[in-house]
Regions:
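Glycine-rich beta->alpha junctions and the first turn(s) of the following alpha-helix
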Residues: 200-298
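FAD-binding subdomain of flavoenzyme oxidoreductases
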Residues: 139-214
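Glycine-rich flavin
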Residues: 45-55, 59-156, 166-178
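C-terminal helix-coil-helix/basic helical segment that borders enzyme active sites and/or dimer interfaces
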Residues: 33, 37-40, 300-333, 349-357
Length: 402
């Protein structure tokens, strides 16, 4: 099986499609799991593991094939992320984040795309934050500060989503009066990185802060991300926006955490006899019911999300258009999966008793990780309100996150 090294190659698209990245993720999972403690302690991916992920093509899952990427459809992509998350949530989180970022390549001119992604370690990361991009000759002057930059320790380039300001200081506006927001890309070496990622869970993502001050960004590294009219790549994947892949991928992280936690509890229940009890956990009727219900929750959430992605991808292949109804379905399935996964982890954690609190056992980190996933934008309860408004025929809020 050909190893994807990241630069453009002369292989056929069919060769890229033939690579079974899910199987490849399963093969690498034991290596990732063996690094899990080190990942958390370092608050980043170790260099050796990063190299293995680069060699396996895992940072380029959503990158166009024209640039040596896999250009995976949504469903196999989230299956890969789920498999990685079973081994380590921080690794899966970083891969999902930078994969979504790499979809920007579909909007860049070929030379600019090669400058960012052409090298094997051509990895792009970004985070949200305030700032502006002022129009100047040949490009823009960017001043901004960004946080939650997952994968930034692995990246060679960083990005910024900012409102455009004209030379005279007036904001550039769309016809409807809303601000024009573009994505600006620049080498990581041009930014000031600040270590702020001291958190409860997903410690290994290194989601630090970065800033730039009056940085000149050439116009060729500015794109109207997710604007269909600006796309140069026309594969099926890019009929979806990064928003749908972020939502689905982070839900897959949650489901991978839940699957691994529940499996670990089932293993524990075979032998553990709680203090004061006469039987093992697995012989306890309450535990039996809890395990069955947890399996049902996780299976239902997974079936909803994966089934929706398969059905919607097939429909988009025919129409080449992602409808609002389809975007709502992905939004609902993704947020639902995160909350069901959290419930499964909570059940397993509490049923494991005092065993779960020791760092040597596989429960406490996953408990912290899932409760960090749920705090991120993708887990917001507000998303249920948005979908509910739509289903009830009301004007939905929160369309920006669809």
């Amino acid at each position: 099986m050909t190893t994807l090294k990241g630069g453009p190659t002369d292989r056929d698209d069919d060769d890229a499609a033939a690579v079974d990245y899910v199987a490849r993720a399963r093969e690498l999972a034991p290596v990732i799991a063996a690094h899990a403690d080190d990942i958390e302690r370092r608050r980043e991916l170790p260099a050796g593991l990063r190299e293995k992920l680069i060699d396996g093509g895992f940072f380029r899952l959503l990158l166009p094939r024209s640039l040596g990427g896999a250009e995976l459809p949504p469903l196999p992509f989230v299956e890969v992320i789920e498999e990685i998350a079973k081994a380590d949530a921080s690794t899966a989180w970083c891969l999902n984040q930078v994969s979504g970022c790499s979809m920007t390549a579909a909007y860049l001119a070929p030379a600019a795309a090669r400058a960012v992604f052409g090298a094997p370690d051509g990895i792009l990361a970004w985070g949200p934050g305030p700032g502006e991009a002022r129009v100047v000759d040949g490009g823009y002057r960017v001043t901004a500060r960004f946080s939650f930059a997952s994968g930034s320790h692995d990246a060679s380039w960083l990005g910024a989503h900012l409102p455009v300001v004209e030379c005279d200081g007036k904001p550039r506006l769309h016809a409807d009066g809303s601000s024009v927001v573009h994505t600006f890309l620049f080498p990581k070496s041009a930014a000031q990185m600040t270590d702020i990622w001291h958190v409860v869970g997903l410690k290994g993502t290194g989601s630090d802060q970065y800033s730039v001050e009056d940085l000149f960004v050439p116009a060729r590294f500015c794109v109207a991300r997710d604007d269909p009219g600006a796309r140069r790549e026309h594969g099926l994947l890019y009929d979806f926006s990064a928003l749908q892949l972020y939502a689905s991928g982070f839900a897959a992280v949650a489901m991978g955490i839940a699957r691994a936690t529940l499996d670990a509890f089932v293993e524990l229940a075979r032998d553990k006899i709680p203090r004061g009890a006469k039987r093992t956990l697995r012989d306890n009727n309450v535990v039996q019911s809890q395990v069955a219900q947890a399996e049902a929750k996780l299976g239902a959430a997974r079936a909803f999300l994966f089934g929706a992605l398969a059905e919607i991808t097939a429909a988009v292949a025919r129409t080449r258009h992602l409808s609002l109804d389809q975007r709502m379905t992905i939004r609902l399935a993704a947020t639902f999966a995160i909350h069901q996964a959290m419930a499964v982890v909570d059940t397993a954690y509490h049923a494991a008793g005092a065993t779960a609190i020791f760092t040597a056992n596989p429960f406490e980190r996953r408990f912290r990780d899932i409760h960090t996933v749920s705090q991120q934008l993708q887990g917001r309860q507000q998303h249920f309100e948005t979908v509910g408004q739509y289903l009830l025929g009301l004007a939905p809020d929160g369309l920006a996150w669809l």
